UniProtKB/Swiss-Prot annotation:
Entry's family note: Belongs to the tetrahydrofolate dehydrogenase/cyclohydrolase family.
GO cellular component: cytosol
Highest rank taxon of the organism: Bacteria
Name recorded for this polypeptide: Bifunctional protein FolD 2
Key word Transport present: no
KW Amino-acid biosynthesis (keyword) present: yes
Reactions catalysed: (6R)-5,10-methylene-5,6,7,8-tetrahydrofolate + NADP(+) = (6R)-5,10-methenyltetrahydrofolate + NADPH; (6R)-5,10-methenyltetrahydrofolate + H2O = (6R)-10-formyltetrahydrofolate + H(+)
Function text: Catalyzes the oxidation of 5,10-methylenetetrahydrofolate to 5,10-methenyltetrahydrofolate and then the hydrolysis of 5,10-methenyltetrahydrofolate to 10-formyltetrahydrofolate.
Keywords for this protein: Amino-acid biosynthesis, Histidine biosynthesis, Hydrolase, Methionine biosynthesis, Multifunctional enzyme, NADP, One-carbon metabolism, Oxidoreductase, Purine biosynthesis
GO terms assigned for molecular function: methenyltetrahydrofolate cyclohydrolase activity; methylenetetrahydrofolate dehydrogenase (NADP+) activity
PANTHER family in the cross-refs: C-1-TETRAHYDROFOLATE SYNTHASE, CYTOPLASMIC, C-1-TETRAHYDROFOLATE SYNTHASE, CYTOPLASMIC-RELATED
CDD domains registered for this protein in UniProt: NAD_bind_m-THF_DH_Cyclohyd
EC identifiers of the protein: 1.5.1.5, 3.5.4.9
Length: 287
C-alpha cells in the first residue's frame, strides 16, 4: 500500500488563482486591491524566507504588500506604535507580524494590539473566540489551510477520530476547533499526554505540529489513516522533513509531504484572509 500524496502546491495555486481573479474583478469595478502590511523584527533566516514567500504570493495575486524590516533591537513600544498606525490606515486590510519575535517583545501583547478585522493570521483572541462559538471570520491560516486541503481531496472528517499532536495557539488548539466544527471527534495530545502511541494509533486523521523531525514512527500510524504533517524541520544535511517518519506513506491512505504540503496552503490562506478583510472593510465603509 502506498499513500496518495496531498499536493499542497497544486491546491495552493488554485486558491491563489481564485484570489487573483477576485482582485482583478475589484479593480475592474474601480475598487482598490487589498493591502497587506508585513512586519519582520530581526534577521532570523527562516523568518526571512517565510516573509519573502508571502510577499511573492501577494505580488502573484495582485495584492499590495508593504514591508517593515526592523532590527532585533526594536522595542515593543515602537512595534505597538507602528501597529496603531496600521490599524488606522485605510489602505491596509491585513497586518502580519512574523513570529517568533525577539525575547524582549511579548507576542501575545502584539497580537492583541492588531485590530481583529485586520488580524489576517487569525491569532487574535476575538477571532479564536468566534471560531470557538462556530461563527468564524478570519481563521488561523495553517489550520484552515489544512481543512481546505482535505476538502479539495473530498476527504470528509465528519464522524472520524482526529488526533492532533501539539497544542500550540498557532496550530494545535485552533486545528482542534476546525476539526470539531467539521464534525470530527477530536483528541489533542501535548507534552503531558501519557501513552502517545496509543492515541496516535487510533487516529483516522492525524495532524502533527511538534517541530521535531520524524517524531512519530511509521508503525504508530493506523492503516488507511490521513496524515497531515505540519512540521517543517531542517536536518543536518540541510534537507527538510516533517514530524512523521516518511515511511508512514507505506501505511497511511493520504499524506501531506514536507515540503510542499501544508506550507503553501498557509500562505494561500493568508491571501484569502486579506481579501476577505478588504471586503469586510468595504462593506463597513458602505454601511
Amino acid at each position: 500500500m502506498s499513500a496518495q500524496v496531498i499536493n499542497g502546491k497544486v491546491v495552493a495555486k488554485t486558491v491563489i488563482d481564485r484570489v487573483k481573479q477576485r482582485v482583478q474583478l475589484r479593480k475592474s469595478q474601480g475598487l482598490r486591491a487589498p493591502g497587506l502590511a508585513v512586519i519582520l523584527i530581526g534577521d532570523d533566516p527562516a523568518s526571512s524566507v517565510y516573509v519573502n514567500n508571502k510577499k511573492k504570493a501577494c505580488e502573484e495575486a495582485g495584492l499590495v504588500s508593504k514591508s517593515w524590516n526592523w532590527p532585533s533591537k526594536a522595542t515593543q513600544y515602537e512595534l505597538l506604535e507602528l501597529i496603531k498606525q496600521l490599524n488606522e490606515d485605510t489602505s491596509i486590510d491585513g497586518i502580519l507580524v512574523q513570529l517568533p519575535l525577539p525575547d524582549h517583545i511579548d507576542a501575545e501583547t502584539i497580537i492583541e494590539a492588531i485590530h481583529p478585522d485586520k488580524d489576517v493570521d487569525g491569532f487574535h483572541p476575538y477571532n479564536i473566540g468566534r471560531l470557538t462559538v462556530r461563527m468564524p471570520t478570519l481563521r488561523p491560516c495553517t489550520p484552515y489551510g489544512c481543512m481546505n486541503l482535505l476538502n479539495h481531496y473530498d476527504l470528509s472528517v465528519k464522524g472520524k477520530h482526529a488526533v492532533i499532536v501539539g497544542a500550540s495557539n498557532i496550530v494545535g488548539r485552533p486545528m482542534s476547533l476546525e476539526l470539531l466544527l467539521a464534525g470530527a471527534t477530536t483528541t489533542v495530545c501535548h507534552r503531558f499526554t501519557a501513552d502517545l502511541q496509543t492515541h496516535v494509533s487510533m487516529a483516522d486523521i492525524l495532524v502533527t505540529a511538534v517541530g521535531k523531525p520524524n517524531f512519530i514512527p511509521a508503525d504508530w500510524i493506523k492503516p488507511g489513516a490521513i496524515v497531515v504533517d505540519v512540521g517543517i524541520n531542517r536536518l543536518p544535511d540541510g534537507s527538510l522533513t516533517g514530524d512523521v517518519d516518511p515511511r508512514a506513506r507505506e501505511v497511511a491512505a493520504y499524506v501531506t509531504p514536507v515540503p510542499g504540503g501544508v506550507g503553501p496552503m498557509t500562505i494561500a490562506t493568508l491571501l484569502e484572509n486579506t481579501l476577505k478583510a478588504c471586503e469586510i472593510h468595504q462593506l463597513g465603509a458602505v454601511s
